[in-house]
A protein has these predicted regions:
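Short, intrinsically disordered low-complexity segments enriched in Ser/Thr with adjacent Pro
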Residues: 9, 18-23, 44-47
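Non-catalytic accessory segments of hydrolases
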Residues: 55-235
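Active-site loop->helix "elbow" adjoining a glycine-rich segment at hydrolase catalytic centers
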Residues: 183, 236-240, 268-271
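Alpha/beta-hydrolase active-site loop
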Residues: 231-253
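Substrate-access "cap/lid" subdomains that shape
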Residues: 250, 284, 289, 293-409
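Alpha/beta-hydrolase fold nucleophile elbow
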Residues: 256-267
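Catalytic nucleophile serine of serine hydrolases
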Residues: 266-269, 281, 294
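Short glycine-enriched nucleophile-adjacent loop
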Residues: 271-283
Length: 410
């Protein structure tokens, strides 16, 4: 082996300095572990050379250049007419609005259908991702909270985020429908992320693929029901997904899909959302199969704890319980900054997450047993060996744990 040259020695020295800085940093919080490890996973997906990740990256190749779009036929939806574009064998619709902008008086409330429109709406570009942990409102998610490269043309985060994307090989026929719920816990992510492009699945499987943006973190899961707010405010993000499934039931036939053959599936936080839907009466009958990919078997937050988190947020904003109406007039940045200060609000996956409200989510999806409401739904569950070690990176003892250490904490 040769002796490193001057440039090689400089690189080695720089790496050593970086490593000393890393080791000198204080231990990460649970929420910081989750964010850091999710960023590392996405970076691995982007940089790794193995075939699986190359295939993930290849899904975005068709978006690498600005195209003169060949339009699809106009599709009539229950909200209004839309038109997408053609992409080889596919017809693609991006940024389809399924809900009214959840702002002002609609903030911290279940979603509402949008006002109908009569002019043809172009569905050729991605809708805004939800405001999320670690990303300032208006910024793109790429390289920020979760390291996920934003898809070309994806706008910055916004409260007005209730959009879906649809890929299909044709507007006639009855294809199986697959609705993808993105990862990132309940606080981060986007259905428009580059690695979630649904084109390859629609091409290879001849299914109609749907990806979803929905409210996240404090805007999706702040439970105000015990403080005079909407009883289901703590489930707003999950109720967004229920509204998506209602949209699929009412409209997917016009996109060549079969509303009687709908599968919900998701990975990591998306898998957790699939599990939550199985305990929600509002979702009953809107899907027919479920796939949980590396979904954490975590319990929903108890109502009492969710209420404590809401009180803490009001305190951080200088508001009292009787001031809930003032939440409507605050900026998204003010609310997000206050939420970031509340250590007690960090759910098991980081950030705010669903709670048992007795209405939208009347019981836990796992405890004490499986919900009877979804007993007839076939479920596929997948895991990877040692996958939970993803969340140990950043722990001061990472790399030193013994099996006894881990089992003693189980």
């Amino acid at each position: 082996l040769g002796v490193p040259g001057r440039s090689g020695l400089a690189a080695i020295s720089a790496e050593a300095v970086d490593e000393r800085k890393r080791l000198a940093r204080p231990p990460l919080s649970v929420a910081e572990w989750a964010g850091q490890t999710f960023r590392d996973f996405i970076r691995l997906a982007k940089d790794a050379d193995d075939t699986h990740f190359r295939e993930i990256r290849s899904m975005t190749d068709v978006q690498d250049q600005v195209r003169d779009l060949e339009r699809t036929a106009v599709v009539a939806t229950t909200n209004g007419p839309v038109r997408g574009y053609r992409e080889d064998v596919l017809q693609v619709f991006k940024g389809l609005r399924y809900g009214a902008a959840p702002v002002g008086a609609l903030r911290f409330r279940p979603p509402r259908r949008p006002a109908p429109w009569t002019d043809v709406a172009d569905a050729v570009s991605l809708g805004a991702p939800a405001i999320q942990a670690g990303v300032a409102p208006g910024e793109t998610t790429g390289g920020r909270s979760n390291g996920d490269p934003a898809a070309p043309g994806q706008p910055g985060t916004d409260e007005d985020c209730l959009f879906i994307n649809v890929w299909t090989q044709g507007l006639s026929g009855k294809r199986p429908v697959m609705v993808w719920l993105h990862g990132g816990g309940f606080s981060n992510g986007s259905g428009g992320a580059a690695m979630y492009d649904g084109g390859n699945l629609a091409r290879r499987g001849d299914v109609v693929t749907v990806t979803v943006n929905h409210r996240l973190n404090v805007f999706g899961y702040l439970h105000l029901g015990e403080l005079g707010g909407d009883p289901s405010s703590g489930q707003a993000g999950m109720l967004d997904i229920v509204l998506v499934l209602e949209w699929v039931r009412d409209n997917i036939a016009a996109f060549g899909g079969d509303p009687a053959d709908v599968t919900i599936f998701g990975e990591s936080g998306g898998g957790a959302k699939v599990s939550m839907l199985q305990a929600m009466p509002g979702a009953h009958g809107l899907y027919h199969r479920a796939i949980v990919q590396s979904g954490p078997g975590l319990r929903a937050i108890p109502t009492a704890r969710a209420t404590e988190n809401a009180r803490a947020l009001l305190d951080a904003l200088g508001l009292k319980t009787g001031d809930l109406a003032r939440l409507e007039g605050l900026s998204a940045a003010e609310i997000q900054a206050a939420a970031a200060k509340i250590a007690g609000a960090q759910g098991p996956m980081g950030g705010f997450s669903p709670c048992i409200d007795g209405i939208a989510l009347p019981r836990d999806p796992f405890h004490p047993d499986a919900p009877a409401i979804s007993a007839g739904v076939p479920v596929m569950v997948g895991t990877n060996k040692d996958e939970a070690t993803l969340f140990l990176r950043g722990h001061p003892k990472f790399g030193e744990f013994t099996e006894e250490d881990l089992t003693s904490r189980a």
